Amino acid sequence: MNILSLVQTALELSLICSLTVLALFLSYSMLNVCDLSTDGCFTLGAAVGAMVAIAGHPYLAILAAMGAGVLSGFIAALLQTKMGIDSLLAGIIVNTGLYSINIAVMGGSSLLNMNKTETVFTKARALLQGTFLAEQYKLLVAAIAVIAVIVFLALFLHTRLGLAIRATGDNPDMVRSSSINPTFPTIVGLCVANAFTGLSGCLLAQSQKSVSIDIGTGMVTIALASLLMGQVLLGKGSILKRAIGMVVGAFAFRLVYTIALRLDMPAFMLKLVSSVIVVLAIATPYFKKQLPMLRRRMAARKEARLHAED
């Protein structure tokens, strides 16, 4: 097993997927909305990005994928804010509808081949030809996208609108009492979050030069696991620190995933690996809180035994 190759593969994929984790960070951690349309939105971004790239516009494909993500987030937000549908149910409805839309976007096919298509990655490779970064072109493109999104979040969430989004997630009743309508921050937050998800799908499609209808299946689980791992590894703090934690969590998850693949683990077992990682990530903070109490109980029992022996 080539360790360097393994780490590089994990890093490339984790950077692309961390855009979805950052989307979940905005919608789930900041806005307190559990958006289950992530899988469908990721595929939508991949499909739209692929079709526009095939038409000969790889850079425009990125904007188109993000725009498609905005529309997906807008519909999910409308279902929640204007129709009174619970966020979980709204996400499921949008995700279900997106399956048909994604097939339509892909021209009725469940698979798109982009082998002869110019992408942002092939353009980056040509641009870096002859330099020491020539072999790291995928890593560089993904890193630029992630840095741009992190900087945007760090700045945006400190603006008036960004603070309104955070306040809506913390306490919507307080926001209403402050004469602020929580509908608008919710809509904007979900639109921005889904734009990041669409971007993530687009970059993955252009990176692997193919799109299948199930490319986004399980993405919400992967993103949630990465988010929770990031929180465990870096903890709480500033927006910037937490956003970086999402990227670290995505890398840690993808590294475990890549190692499992390199160990020739059967493909059907990978979903179980994802589930176990999610459980461990959720349970770790709980056990951390319980550990001091457990130590006190053990100390009390030990002291009681000593008194009994005396």
Regions found by a protein language model. Name each.
Residues 87-89, 116, 138-143, 215-222, ...:
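Loop-to-transmembrane alpha-helix initiation sites
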Residues 194-272:
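Transmembrane alpha-helical segments in multi-pass inner-membrane proteins
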Residues 170-177, 181-184, 256-310:
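Cytosolic-side transmembrane-helix boundaries in multi-pass membrane proteins
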Residues 87, 91, 98-158, 188, ...:
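Transmembrane helix-bundle core of multi-pass membrane transporters
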Residues 57-96, 101, 146-147, 248-249, ...:
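Alpha-helical transmembrane segments within multi-pass membrane transporters and channels
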Residues 72, 135-215, 220:
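Helix-loop-helix "hairpin" substructures at the membrane interface of multi-pass membrane proteins
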Residues 28-83, 128, 237-238, 262:
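Membrane-embedded helix boundary and interhelical linker motif in transport proteins
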Residues 1-20, 48, 54-60, 131-136:
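Membrane-interfacial amphipathic/re-entrant helices at transmembrane-helix boundaries
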